[in-house]
UniProtKB/Swiss-Prot annotation:
Transmembrane segments: none annotated. Residues 145-156 have a biased composition (Basic residues). Residues 1-11, 56-109, 120-144, 157-173 have a biased composition (Basic and acidic residues). Residues 17-41 have a biased composition (Polar residues). Signal peptide: none annotated. Residues 1-173 are annotated as: Disordered. It comes from the Eukaryota. This is Uncharacterized protein T15H9.5.
Amino acid sequence: MLCAKNKKDPKPPPASFSETSKVQNVQNTQPKPAAPSQMSIDESHSKNQKLPSAEKSVEECKKPVSPEKKKSPIKVLSEKKLKSKKKEEDKEPDEKVEKDVKKEVKADNNEPLVKNLKIAKKEQEEENPKTDLESHKDEAEAKKKESRRQKKMRNKNSKEGSVEKMEKSEKAY
């Protein structure tokens, strides 16, 4: 009951605010001229700053970009690769040879290090023999690795076999 009392009855608007009178009032009003100080600021601002997009017509902006102008990311990447290849070709042959030699030297430098590392490990094992527990752990890890490798090979072989079976069954039909 309290809610019903609090609600206001919608009253119709007075007759003076009818639809036609609203339209007539809007049409009769004249636009007010801007203040002279405001106009001078706007004019000076527009003279000082001309945006390039403002010079374009709206129609030009709405035109879709032609497919010739659009570049796919793949084309852009391929152009970059071509440019980099041209740069490499433009380099003097001495620079290319130097780079190749440096790469070869790095590979050669690693081989003695690997050999030395293996020799050092063997020497360390001879000097400090492993305890039974450590050797047992190493053997267990080696067995696990071997079993994983065998399992992968079995899976690979079974997949290849299943593919061959599928091909044979397709040929039979």
